Amino acid sequence: MYDTIEDFLQSDNNIMPIRYPYREIRKMTKGFKIKLGKGGFGSVFKGQLRSGCYVAVKMLDKATGKGQDFINEVNTLGRIYHANVVQLIGYCVDGPKHVLVYEFMQNGSLDKYIFSKPNDNEQCLNLHQLYDISLGIARGIDYLHKGCNMRILHFDIKPHNILLDDNFIPKISDFGLAKLYPRGESIVSLTVARGTTGYIAPELFYRNVGGISYKADVYSFGMLIMEIAGRRKNLNALAEHYSSQFYFPFWVYDQLNEGNEISITDASEEEMKVARKMMIVGLWCIQTRPNDRPSMNKVVEMLEGDEQDLEFPYLKPSFYLQDLPKEVDGNNHSSSMMTSSELEDSSIDEIVEIPKEKDEDSSLPQTSQLYALNLPSKAFTFNE
């Protein structure tokens, strides 16, 4: 398997990750002594190279199948370099053991900073810092979409997959669900929907919303930046409908559309302007139809520009609580849907892969469901 990976990298890139023997992996981690955490595809340990540099060593789970997640990581991270994308230093393949070695991110993942409570031990980041982090993430995704020989779709942009270095520079990580396709092609073919509950674009479920493209990552970024600006998760299924606690983007849209100010605890007036800009950008990114969303290049421009120059989206984002996936049986290719209480009890970090329905007449939910989709005949679009 690794001959195929190496041939691919050598033909397309001058940067080659190092292949380590397994004994070297055990040595750099001191027998996997310090466990940093566990993600969707395996456990991560702290290691140290002979040079003295610290690294994060990911041991991929055996349950991850035929090694596609390993191939995805090496085929993407092994060929690129960007300040806002985590660097793959090396890898190891030893029988069933698949190991990835990354640069070490001192401050861990973003989720613990935006979802932490005031009495938590984590450093509290102000809105200016969170804005800088958001802009860095946007630049990283834009690079994946347009800065490489092949377009790279991440398909799992979320707070847990954004790592922060010692200067709180954000780095996009975890490319296990990533897909590469030629830059000249606008639509990508998928046999299954992929991503994490709460960040998955609607076109991954409903064909007549639009084709699957890099705009799926734009949607995920929109959900992410809404959570960053609000310092909270977008969904609380146990809260009252139409309240700020139920579905944050709905509430933000209504407040801003009515000309109301959104109050954030301990935020200065200048910070509130920054938060408002981030929220407006987020609302553009989570538009239901892909063509109504900006490209990540445009997102970077919007974030770098003045808040007063931003046009407010007149399409309210749509959300279907009854259509969120609960679980997937990979053997029989069936899925079930969550109720409100089940969604609240579920892990937001659960990665799901959902087989696309073969029925060509699959359509959007009807108005009898929780929220009806309201798509006017004329819409402002971001075509390229």
Label the model's feature ranges:
Residues 1-6, 55, 243, 262-384:
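Intrinsically disordered, low-complexity cytosolic regulatory tails
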Residues 139-152:
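Protein kinase catalytic-loop region centered on the HRD/HxD motif
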Residues 89-96, 106:
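Short beta-strand micro-motifs within the conserved protein kinase catalytic domain, predominantly
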Residues 70-75:
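Regulatory alphaC helix of protein kinase catalytic domains
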Residues 45-62, 87:
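Glycine-rich ATP phosphate-binding loop
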Residues 217:
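Conserved catalytic-loop aspartate of Hanks-type protein kinases
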